Structure formats: structure tokens, C-alpha cells
A protein has these predicted regions:
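Short loop/edge segments at beta-strand edges and connector loops
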Residues: 16-17, 54, 81-83, 156-159
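Predominantly a Rossmann-like dinucleotide-binding segment in NAD(P)-dependent oxidoreductases
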Residues: 85-153
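Contiguous beta-strand/loop segments that form the cofactor/metal-binding neighborhood of enzyme cores
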Residues: 135, 141-177
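Residues embedded in well-ordered beta-strands within globular domains across many folds
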Residues: 16, 30, 107-110, 156
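Histidine-centered beta-alpha loop that forms part of the nucleotide-sugar donor binding/catalytic region
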Residues: 34, 57, 83-84, 114
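Residue-level signal for alpha-helix termini/capping positions
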Residues: 23, 46-47, 73, 99-102, ...
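Rossmann-fold dehydrogenase core element
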Residues: 66-84, 105-109
């Protein structure tokens, strides 16, 4: 009933109350749902033969990511983390400039992302896979890896945990250069 009213108010031509029915009517899927649903929605979409962009955090375990990437590759499907920054022309221009050496040798990169939230909220709920790492690390680490690569020699994590959720995490990647 509320879906009918919403569709009428905003001119939505098609809407579904079953995910399977939705999948029958699209060519690709953009998963931007609560963290705990990313794996299931992405897997269902791939198994229905759909290309998928999935918001961060992409998956909550490496095993889930490998499983879905392998399936997508075998079935010739596109599966990407929906990191808009990675494809932003200005960010890629910055990466090109840095790698060209025009500013000299890069010896240190610092990125920081933060968000003010008040409990209770998904970001502070361990049951909903909240926490600083799940919320912000993919974007911050993507910038460093784009600039310096994946061949870091060591890493350290420093976190402040409250109620089972990291409310602050600092990641230090050490590179051999």
C-alpha cells in the first residue's frame, strides 16, 4: 500500500516487493543497502546473470569477495566495488601527476575520513557491521594504494573500540621505498 502511494506520488513506473521479481526486470544492479545484505544481494544478482556494482564495504570477509569475484569472472559478469572516487577524473588526474614525479618522491601519504554520529545508529552497531573500518577504510586505503601500490612491506592497526565497534582506526602501511 505504501509502495503504491510512493510510486503514484513520484511517478515510479515499476516497483517490486520480491527481489527475484526485481532481478527479472533489470540488466544490472547497484547494491546500496545495509552492510549485512551486500553479500546476499550481490550473490543473488550475479546468479541471476546481472552485472553488479556494490557499495562499500564491498563484502565483510575476503572469502565472500573471492567467491563472488570468481563467479563473476567465470560467468563473464562485471562485479565492482562502487567506489566513485576511483573513477573520478580529478582524482585520476591527481594520481597521474603524483606518479609523473612532478612533485618529487612521495614518502608519506595521509588520508582521513570521519563522520559525526550519535548513538543509536548503524555506524555504531556491531550487529549491523558498523565501525570506522567498514565505513571509511575502503576509500582511504584506495587512495594510498592508487598512489603507492599494493606492495607494502608491513602494516599496523591502532583502534579505539567501544561496545565492540571501532569508533576510531588508524592504519599505517609501510612501503619498502
Amino acid at each position: 500500500e505504501s509502495a503504491d502511494a510512493f510510486a503514484a506520488q513520484f511517478g515510479v513506473k515499476a516497483y517490486f516487493d520480491k527481489y527475484e521479481e526485481f532481478l527479472e526486470n533489470v540488466d544490472a544492479v547497484y547494491v546500496a543497502s545495509p552492510h549485512l545484505t551486500h553479500y546476499d544481494y550481490t550473490k543473488q544478482s550475479l546468479y541471476a546473470g546481472k552485472h553488479v556494482l556494490c557499495e562499500i564495504p564491498f563484502m565483510l570477509s575476503a572469502a565472500q569477495a573471492y567467491e563472488l569475484y570468481d563467479y563473476a569472472e567465470i560467468n563473464n559478469l562485471v562485479l565492482l566495488e562502487a567506489s566513485k572516487t576511483a573513477f573520478c577524473p580529478s582524482f585520476n588526474h591527481l594520481v597521474t601527476l603524483v606518479k609523473s614525479g612532478v612533485i618529487g618522491d612521495v614518502v608519506d601519504v595521509k588520508t582521513s575520513l570521519s563522520k559525526m554520529v550519535s548513538a543509536p545508529t548503524r555506524e555504531l552497531d556491531v550487529v549491523q557491521a558498523g565501525g570506522a573500518m567498514n565505513e571509511h577504510a575502503p576509500l582511504a586505503l584506495m587512495a594510498i594504494i592508487k598512489l603507492l601500490g599494493k606492495e607494502y612491506s608491513d602494516f599496523d592497526f591502532h583502534s579505539k573500540v567501544e561496545n565492540g565497534v571501532d569508533v576510531y582506526t588508524k592504519v599505517v602501511l609501510n612501503y619498502p621505498h
